[in-house]
UniProtKB/Swiss-Prot annotation:
Protein name as annotated: Dedicator of cytokinesis protein 4
Gene Ontology molecular function, alphabetical: GTPase activator activity; guanyl-nucleotide exchange factor activity; PDZ domain binding; receptor tyrosine kinase binding; SH3 domain binding; small GTPase binding
GO cellular component labels: cytosol; glutamatergic synapse; Golgi apparatus; membrane; nucleolus; plasma membrane; postsynapse; stereocilium
Origin species: Mus musculus (Mouse)
Keywords associated with the record: Cell membrane, Cytoplasm, Guanine-nucleotide releasing factor, Membrane, Phosphoprotein, SH3 domain, SH3-binding
């Protein structure tokens, strides 16, 4: 039976449990579990990491831990009762673990490794804490390290700042908010501004001396030197080096490294230097022989200097090499370091070029104990300590020092009867009172043990030597008296014996007879002469002699012979026990000299403070002893001396001696009667404050009042103890009188000088310190009343000095911080006074920082004592006194401008944060009763309204992101909890007082605005938190967003009809709330939109405002990253609210607006789909197809469905930027054209918008044109750039702006040059299908055609797509996927290459048009693409597989042509047809014939550098050894069985026969051309081909071609053999008449096409000038199955996605035209190395017209590109295939016309061209040999651009939604008198007829500029009849106050729209393509 657990509540899993048993809970080792129940060795509970899943697990798998349970029962919470630091470490490491792995994923390697080390270090420290064997100090140290590392890691990972108290986390509920703020602020400040250490230390380590001439031992002496004061500031660090320049004792680190300690900040200056003096130990002269002298001398060697400035910039451990300078003149040795510092080192030599002193230096900061801990490794090995000279900046009590520093300065000696000066050495001894030398009390420096004697270095031949060597003598105090120092002087001989001869001595006693030590300073000692054998051991013999010249001269002792020799030393005593001051000694011995007491007390102020604190206790005993002796006589003097000593301890240098005085007062003070004299004298001074002129001394007294009161209180206590409490009332009266005097002087106002206010300030500064002393003698209430009266006596007039006001407030602050205030009884007495002064200061906005600090302390105390009843009353007082002023203060300080300086800004933030914390503390402490009293306190509704507005405004300020640092989440959550609690209280007041007739819009709007920004706070978005953090927040506060959302809904429902005031203003804010991914919040808020729509419908009959606001706000919000897929679905769920059973509003008639409501929601939902896709795509770093496609989708949606033109323009520019970033310059130009189309050439002013300045519409359109042209240029789309150049040139021309017109014409010319000169790569096109539900909405289950990048083939494109969609699966087949793929929760990509089908064939079929021009039209403006799949139908014939080889042809039609505003567009329609084997054969032959013609033509015109391609092509067709050649087609389709079984294929069989004959004719001519150009080594192959050709021709039954179509032996520039069609065996017309069109084989037309009025087709009446009609310019013969002749083989590479289906090609691409619709495009062969396609023609029209051949003039009939085949037969044109001479005949269509380049003319009028037109120009029935002026079938580019020209463009239709009309894509058929009305499927729509321009004609002898007319590009930009009816967005336009100036007339003559023969062209009707297109879709 399961029993709830009592104690087993919390445990850690010690072994993983799989949970395979029923109801088992899977656990991993290390998981923590909360246990709910137990049963027979099993527990039931849950893992804390996933509390929603409960289950059972074995009890043996869990280690139980102690825990406390809060809120026992169903919602109990278990907290482990372990060290809080351990708990924090555990939870933090878990959070870090997840984030640490993410660092690796994000490739943040540096932080990854650093965090790994820190985590390991924390784990090690955690083990140490858990073991529990650490000492208290060590545990504290470990916790400090742990928290420091936790804080570092949290900061690096962007986690929250953790508030801590003594290394433990604090619960915000357990402390006041003000205290929480202080903890956070302290940790934040500590993090931002590291504490500056007051103490610094320099670590020095000697490495080696590098010098070439070593060989003697050296002494190296380091010291710190102040170059500013020219003195050393530290002791010396002394070390010895061996002969190699290395430390002599390497095993003793303390001998070669030292720490210069206690350097104050004043010592860290640039003029502090490290000086190094090097002394050698050896011979007198460096060059002497080794054995010359056995005696060793100390001799100067060198000096080095280093400035400490290099160390101030940063800590360095790098080794430094110091230059060592040698002294040339030994007499200057004492100042060599000064000269080097002064840069006077030119007089010194370096010890060597490579010489130097290698040292390591490091500057350390902090207390010496802290340094010992942090650098324990250094101290554990040993390091010597080098002190400062003298005391440190701060003298600590108990510090014992007794160091006498002696500097051996210099000497003056006589020659001693010698011709040269002496070599003097000084030896020093310390001799005690018994005449015995003191052992080991002479220190040369740290690092060297003390010695018993000292030997100076020797200066060679110098009678005035200067040594300046510093020595320390650490002599014990008890050895000082009677001891002296003896200096012995010896001459050092340089002879072989090297003996040292004594010639004199000096001495100096350490202490005088009166007990004073040797005074500091320089002393000139007498040198007493003596002999070598003089016995100096008997000190009594010389101690009677004078030792100093000063004493000697003073005594005027004539008995002693005067001496010229002297010796100077400098002494400095650093002692805590001995003194050199006689006045101090006189005071301490006052009883022996009672007559000197007055003088001694007066001189006390002149004694150095360090001397006084050394004898502090003795001095105080002396003073109170004198007071007891005669208080009447010495009372005032003793009082003044006491004041001086007390104030002396205020100095920072002696501050640490205050505890010494406190100890004295408590333990040693015995003046039981002193309180009377102290009170008396103190009152005397206070009474005279108001009268005294000079108050400096009085202020000194007031400053010392704290310790005076301590003495008074202690004295009274001693008296009470001694007398049993006598005179108590008398004492109380004295204190009362004293404080009354104080209150009187405090109440006085300062007059004139302000000295009184200064005295008041001094008193107030120290008065709070008296409280604790008074409490020792008086009751708490008594003291509180005394303090209240004293503080209440302060003047409240605000014109008092600001300094006094500040001091007064500081006094209030100290009062609040005092022990007195912590008592509830006293606090209730003092609180009104405190609040009164605070109110005054806050009202004047003065001393805000101090006010905030005081308030913080007040609330800290209230929180600590919140359980007491008195606290509620205190809250009442504070609310009544401060709440209003506190709100106003916060509003005031937050509205101030930010300070410029960082310090002021930091101060501003501090004071703001403290006031905010105070307000929050007050509100949190308020109960229902307090809120009720507060609301009832307002007498009028206006006051309540002002208060509510004020507090709502403050709340909005409090939740600003910048209010607290970003990592203060704890503080933010506490603040939000207080705010929402307060709002819930205040919302009732809002409902009760401001509804119905009292409705106030402003206060309700403020409320809703506050609620919205509250919910939207970043710190409340729990979804962004880690699971553990989210769990903690929910457990403590719940989801405050939902609470506030419910409150919003409730308040909204209370508004009633007043809701209309907030529509549509609140739509945006509420929408922002609903975008938060919190289901409960969304469920509450989304129905409000339904309510808004309902009320808006009631008011205005529609909800357009709601709709507009929703859409506008949705875009901006979702762009900011808000909203998700779930929100879209939830928002869509509003639709059921419009059903027959609504859930909210039941009275409205739903049917009136249900439909529009559903439509709105559906529209918004679709917009969200696109916005979500857009946002997700924008998160990707690089620009890819997804980003661009998504932007296009959103752009189109704004235009077509929402008609939001401003948003449309914004997304145009976003798309433009994406294209530029991806270097899609062509697409960028098309994109910008969308905006260009919305503008007109007008002078309407436009506002600033995006990056555009304020300018006119004309200027902006000009700028756009130039930008677009530039992008077309960069994208190598020069043809489109030419059109825009012409358009903008028209504008320049109309304004007579010839300068810019010239530039534009030159730009246009440069584009023509680029077309002809630069190479352009033809891109591949790929069809991509996106299947599956995991794709974005704009791609899901759709298919697109994509334009590939340069050089990008199928494999590369497929890999790129898979990289963009890494989770997608590539489908390996080209079949249509089934429904399961469409609905799959996955991503499937289907990719294969497709062939572009150019819509306009006119340029492609023109003879003589360069390939550079044609290549553009093959792959631009493409709407249709094709893909062929071969298959066998029926039984497959093994002998001839072509009999059953069918082709499935798929045609894809796009919504827009490529290229366009994107590199890919969606497939709008797909058509699938099957091509029969016969149709396939026809297409293959047509393609091969076309290929042959092209190669022959290129060879003739020498475009081909190499004849090999032609050779291979001829060889492949004639010698078809692979698949059998065309004979396989004969076997398959010309046999009787096939003809009888397929009677419907008669025409097709005839066509196939005709193509075979045509191929033979082309081959014959090709061989003739080949023979002319074939190189000699290829002649045998050529001969073989000729022989095989005759065999092949005979197989066709052809002996010779008819005379009229024989191949010409003469070479023509564009020549090709003519085609004979009368050799076809089948009759092609009902009457049996054979129509034979005369044409060049290179302009061979296919049979005529049926005209189609389909909106998506090109002019069906067009026929090709190059080959039969083809739907692809690329795939010419891709359908070639493997096993037949090579006559159809191709050199082109085949498409990889189809199999072979033509007789001779190894690769295949099925390419036949549709069977169900008529083909609309004509194309030519593509020069690209890619699969080419054949063309499937439609059947020939039965009624053919006769062709009248006129051989004589060499002209063959010319095809008009706009006529069907039979119509083209009537107009013969010159042909290069004629049998005439090489002269090319003039085309009749060129007669009478100017010839222009192949670009469209600049239109002067706009038109709306139609698909079909009827020509009004009759055509002659026959060809006349005379050259006359005949109407051209191809309009000239110079005359008016007929619709036939402009309509061929696939770019000229536009979206009518844009408000801009444009031409539809169409083509015009200009016939020659014969109409094929049977083919027409639509009636032309009449439109206005343009007037033609008169065209000059040429006479018969005149030649036009060009030999033949060229067809311009089949499109024209900017041809439109109507300007845009949709105006520009209002936000972008400026109202025009006056009409713009009229445009000047154009300089060009008006162009006539009449034709030359007087007839008028019939304007074509519009071609009704389903989606009209725009200029931007060029």
């Amino acid at each position: 039976m399961w029993i709830p657990t009592e104690h087993e509540k919390y445990g850690v899993v010690i072994a993983s449990f799989r949970g395979t048993v029923p109801y088992g809970l899977s656990l991993e080792i290390g998981d923590t579990v909360q246990i709910l129940e137990k049963c027979d060795g099993w527990y039931r509970g849950f893992a804390l990491k996933n509390p929603n899943i409960k289950g059972i697990f074995p009890s043996s798998y869990v280690h139980l831990k102690n825990a406390c349970v809060k809120n026992k029962g169903q919602f109990e919470m278990v907290i482990p009762t372990e060290d809080s630091v351990i708990t924090e470490m555990t939870s933090t490491l878990r959070d870090w673990g997840t984030m640490w792995k993410q660092l690796y994923v994000r490739n943040e390697g540096d932080l990854f490794h650093r965090l790994w080390h820190i985590m390991n270090e924390i784990l090690d420290l955690r083990r140490q804490v858990l073991v529990g064997h650490l000492t208290h100090d060590r545990m504290k140290d470990v916790k400090r390290h742990i928290t420091a590392r936790l804080d570092w890691g949290n900061e690096q990972l962007g986690l929250d700042l953790v508030p801590r108290k003594e290394y433990a986390m604090v619960d915000p509920e357990d402390i006041s908010i003000t205290e929480l703020y202080r903890l956070m602020e302290h940790r934040h400040r500590k993090k931002d501004t590291p504490v500056q250490a007051s103490s610094h230390h320099l670590f020095v380590q000697m490495k080696s001396l590098m010098c070439s001439n070593l060989g003697e031992e050296l002494e190296v002496i380091f010291s710190l030197f102040d170059s500013k004061e020219n003195r050393p500031i530290s002791e010396r660090f002394f070390l010895r080096l061996n002969r190699n320049g290395l430390p002599k004792a390497p095993d003793k680190p303390e001998r070669h490294c030292s720490l210069f300690v206690d350097l104050g900040s004043s010592e860290l200056r640039k003029d502090i230097y490290i000086t190094v003096h090097i002394i050698r130990i050896g011979r007198m002269g460096a060059g002497e022989k080794k054995n010359a002298c056995s005696v060793q001398y100390r001799r100067p060697f060198g000096c080095a200097v280093l400035s400490i400035a290099d160390l101030l910039t940063g800590e360095t451990k790098d080794d430094l090499v110091l230059k060592v300078y040698m002294c040339n003149t030994e007499s200057e040795w004492y100042q060599i370091h000064e000269n080097i510092i002064k840069k006077l080192n030119a007089r010194y030599n370096l010890t060597g070029s490579n010489a130097g002193l290698a040292v390591s230096l490091q500057l350390l900061h902090g207390d010496i104990e802290q340094i010992r801990r942090e650098y324990s490794s250094v101290f554990s090995h040993g390091v010597s300590i080098t002190r400062k000279l003298g005391f440190s900046d701060i003298i600590m009590p108990g510090e014992m020092r007794n160091d006498l520093y002696i500097t051996v300065e210099r000497g003056e000696f006589e020659k001693g009867g010698k011709s040269v000066a002496r070599n003097v050495e000084v030896t020093m001894f310390i001799v005690d009172s018994n005449g015995q030398p003191l052992k080991d009390f002479i220190s040369f420096g740290s690092g060297e043990p003390p010695a018993s004697e000292y030997h100076s270095f020797v200066l060679y031949h110098n009678n005035s030597p200067r040594w300046s060597e510093l020595l320390k003598l650490p002599i014990p105090v008890d050895k000082f008296r009677g001891s002296h120092i003896r200096f012995e002087f010896r001459h050092c001989s340089t002879k072989e014996k090297g003996e040292k001869k004594l010639f004199g001595f000096s001495f100096v006693p350490l202490m005088q007879e009166d007990g004073r030590t040797l005074p500091d300073g320089t002393h000139e000692l007498i040198v007493h002469k003596c002999e070598e054998n003089t016995n100096l051991q008997d000190t009594t013999r010389y101690l009677k002699l004078p030792f100093s010249k000063v004493i000697f001269l003073g005594n005027n002792n004539q008995t002693m012979k005067a001496t010229k020799e002297s010796f100077w030393i400098t002494s400095f005593l650093c002692s805590t026990k001995l003194t050199q001051n006689g006045d101090m000694l006189d005071l301490l011995k006052w009883r022996t000299h009672p007559d000197k007491i007055t003088g001694c007390l007066s001189k006390l102020k002149e004694i150095d403070g360090s001397e006084i604190v050394k004898f502090l206790q003795d001095t105080l005993d002396t003073l109170f002893g004198i007071l007891d002796e005669n208080s009447q006589k010495y009372g005032s003097k003793v009082f003044d001396s006491l004041v001086h000593i007390i104030n002396l301890l205020q100095d920072s240098k002696f501050h640490h001696f205050k505890p010494v005085m406190d100890t004295y007062i408590e333990s040693h003070f015995a003046g039981a009667l002193a309180y009377r004299d102290l009170i008396k004298v103190l009152k005397w001074y206070v009474d005279r404050i108001t009268e005294a002129e000079r108050q400096e001394h009085i202020q000194e007294v007031l400053k010392a009042q704290e310790y005076i009161f301590k003495y008074i209180v202690q004295s009274r206590r001693l008296f009470s103890l001694a007398t049993g409490g006598q005179n108590e009332e008398e004492f109380r009266c004295c204190i009362q009188e004293l404080l009354m005097s104080v209150r009187f002087f405090l109440s006085q106002e300062s007059k004139g000088t302000g000295a009184l206010s200064q005295s008041q300030a001094v008193f107030l500064s120290s008065f709070p310190a008296v409280y604790s002393e008074l409490l020792k003698l008086f009751d708490v209430r008594e003291v509180a009343n005394l303090v209240q009266d004293t503080l209440g006596s302060l003047p409240t007039i605000m014109h008092v000095d600001d300094s006094l006001q500040a001091i007064k407030l500081q006094c209030i602050g100290k009062t609040v911080e005092s022990q007195l205030y912590t008592n509830p009884d006293s606090r209730y007495i003092l609180l009104p006074v405190v609040l009164h002064h605070l109110h005054i200061h806050l009202q004047e906005q003065k001393d805000l920082i101090m006010c905030a600090r005081i308030l913080s302390n007040v609330f800290c105390l209230i929180k600590k004592n919140s359980s007491e009843k008195s606290v509620l009353e205190e809250i009442d007082v504070i609310v009544a006194s401060l709440l209003d002023i506190l709100l106003r203060t916060i509003l005031e300080i937050t509205s101030r401008p930010q300070a410029s300086s960082s310090a002021m800004r930091l101060q501003f933030q501090d004071v703001t944060g403290e006031f905010v914390a105070c307000l929050l503390s007050l509100l949190r402490q308020m109960t229902d009763r307090h809120y009720q009293q507060l609301l009832n306190s307002f007498s009028t509704k206006e006051e309540l309204r002002d208060f509510l507005l004020q507090i709502f405004t403050v709340f909005r300020i409090l939740i600003r992101p910048e209010m607290f640092p970003k990592d203060w989440t704890v503080m933010r959550l506490v603040a939000n909890n207080v705010i929402i609690t307060t709002v819930l209280y205040l919302s009732d007041a809002l409902r009760k007082n401001f509804l119905n007739e009292n409705f106030d819009y402003k206060i309700w709007d403020s409320y809703f605005y506050l609620a919205v920004i509250f919910i939207n706070q970043l710190c409340l978005q729990l979804e962004m938190f880690t699971p553990s953090k989210k769990k903690k927040v929910l457990e403590k506060y719940g989801d405050m967003r939902v609470t506030m959302g419910c409150e919003i809904f409730s308040m909204w429902q209370n508004l009633g009809e007043h809701k209309l005031h907030f529509i549509p203003a609140l739509i945006g804010p509420f929408l922002e709330v609903t975008l938060i991914p919190q289901p409960d919040l969304r469920n509450v808020m989304i129905p409000i939109f339904h309510d808004m729509m309902d009320w808006e419908q009631r008011r205005s009959g529609n909800f357009k405002q709601v709709e507009a606001k929703l859409i506008d706000k949705l875009d901006s919000l979702m762009s900011e990253g808000k909203g998700d897929e779930t929100y879209r679905e939830l928002f869509n769920s509003i639709i059921p609210l419009f059903g027959p059973y609504p859930s909210l509003l039941k009275k409205i008639e739903r049917e009136t607006w249900r439909e529009s409501g559903v439509s709105l929601i559906a529209t918004v939902t679709r917009l969200m789909e696109r916005l979500l896709d857009y946002r997700d795509c924008m998160k990707i770093g690089e620009v890819d197809g997804k980003k661009i496609g998504c932007t296009v989708s959103l752009l189109n949606f704004y235009k077509t469905e929402l008609n939001k033109e401003e948003m449309y323009i914004r997304y145009i520019h976003k798309l433009y930027d994406l294209h530029l970033k991806a270097q899609n310059f062509t697409e960028a130009a098309y994109t910008l054209l969308l905006y260009d189309e919305l503008l007109e050439w007008s002078d309407r002013p436009l506002r600033e918008f995006l990056t555009y300045p304020m300018q006119t519409e004309w200027q902006r359109k000009e700028h756009l044109h130039l930008t677009i042209i530039q992008n077309f240029d960069r994208g190598k789309c020069w043809e489109n750039g030419i059109i825009l150049c012409r358009k903008i040139a028209e504008q320049y021309e109309s304004y007579y702006d010839y300068r810019n017109l010239s530039k534009m014409r030159m730009m246009e010319a440069s584009l023509y040059d680029k077309i002809m000169d630069q190479q352009r790569l033809e891109p591949e096109f790929f069809r991509v299908g996106f299947y599956g539900k995991k794709f974005p909405f704009f791609l899901r289950n759709k298919e697109f055609v994509c334009r590939g990048h340069d050089y990008e083939r199928l494999e590369a494109f497929q890999q790129r797509m898979l990289n963009e969609f890494p989770h997608a699966i590539a489908m390996q087949h080209a079949n249509q996927p089934d429904e399961t793929i469409f609905q799959a929760e996955a991503q499937y990509l289907q990719i294969y290459a497709v062939t572009p089908i150019p819509e306009s064939q006119e340029v492609l079929q023109r003879e003589g048009v360069p390939d550079n021009i044609k290549s553009f039209y093959k792959v631009n403006h493409i709407w249709k693409f094709r893909y062929d799949r071969p298959f066998h139908k029926g039984a497959k014939d093994k002998e001839n597989e072509f009999k059953s080889l069918w082709v499935e042809r798929t045609s894809l039609y796009l919504v827009q042509s490529l290229p366009g505003i994107s590199r890919w567009f969606e497939v709008e329609k797909r058509e699938v047809v099957e091509m029969s084997p016969l149709e396939n054969a026809i297409e293959v032959l047509e393609n091969k014939n076309q290929q042959l013609k092209t190669l022959i033509s290129q060879c003739q015109t020498r475009q081909m550098q190499n004849i090999n391609p032609l050779t291979m092509c001829l060889n492949g067709v004639i010698d078809a050894a692979v698949n059998g050649g065309v004979s396989r087609y004969q076997e398959a389709f010309f046999v009787k069985d096939y003809i009888l079984s397929h009677p419907e294929d008669g025409e097709k069989i005839a066509r196939l026969r005709e193509l075979m004959l045509e191929q033979a004719q082309i081959l014959e001519f090709g061989l003739a051309v080949h023979e002319k150009f074939v190189p000699q080594d290829m002649r045998p192959l050529h001969k073989k081909l000729v022989d095989q050709f005759f065999v092949m021709k005979s197989s066709f039954g052809i002996q010779e071609f008819p005379a009229c179509i024989q191949a010409s032996p003469v070479h023509f520039p564009n020549g090709s053999p003519r085609v004979c069609r009368n050799s076809a065996p089948a009759s092609m017309s009902p009457d049996g008449t054979r129509v034979i069109p005369r044409r060049s084989p290179l302009s061979y037309p296919a049979v005529n096409r049926y005209s189609s009025s389909s909106l998506s087709s090109q002019a069906s009446a067009e026929v090709s000038n190059i080959t039969g009609q083809s739907e692809s310019s690329d795939e010419v013969f891709n359908m070639q199955p493997s096993p037949s002749t090579s006559s159809l083989s191709s050199t082109h590479s085949a498409s990889p996605n189809v199999t072979s289906s033509a007789p001779s090609s190894a690769r295949a691409s099925p390419l036949l035209s549709d069977k169900h619709k008529h083909s609309r495009e004509n194309s030519c062969l593509s020069p690209r190395d890619r699969p080419c396609s054949a063309i499937y023609p439609t059947p020939v029209e039965p009624s053919q017209r006769m062709l009248f051949n006129h051989i004589g003039d060499g002209a063959l009939p010319r095809s008009d590109p706009n006529l069907s085949a039979p119509e083209k037969a009537v107009n013969p044109t010159p042909s290069s295939w004629s049998l005439d001479s090489g002269k090319e005949a003039k085309n009749m269509s060129d007669s009478g016309k100017l010839i222009s380049p192949p670009v469209p003319p600049r239109p002067t009028q706009t038109a709306s061209p139609a698909r079909h037109t009827t020509s009004v120009s009759p055509s002659p029935a026959g060809r006349s040999p005379l050259k006359g002026s005949v109407q051209s079938f191809t309009p000239s580019p110079v005359e008016y651009n007929s619709p036939g020209l402009s309509s061929n463009s696939p770019v000229l239709s536009g979206s009518y939604s844009s408000g801009i009309s444009s031409l539809s894509r169409c083509s015009t058929s200009e016939t020659s008198g014969f109409e094929n009305q049977a083919n027409e499927q639509s009636v032309p729509v009449p439109v206005p007829v343009p007037v033609p321009v008169p065209v000059p004609s040429f006479s018969g002898s005149e030649e036009p500029v060009r030999k033949e007319s060229k067809t311009p590009p089949p499109y024209s930009v900017y041809e439109r009849t109507l300007r845009r009816p949709v105006p520009l967005p209002h936000s972008l336009s400026i109202p025009v106050t006056s009409e713009p100036p009229a445009l000047p007339p154009k300089p060009l003559a008006a162009r006539s729209s009449h034709l030359e023969n007087g007839t008028r062209r019939t304007e074509p009707g519009p071609r009704p393509r389903p989606l009209p297109r725009k200029v931007s879709q060029l």
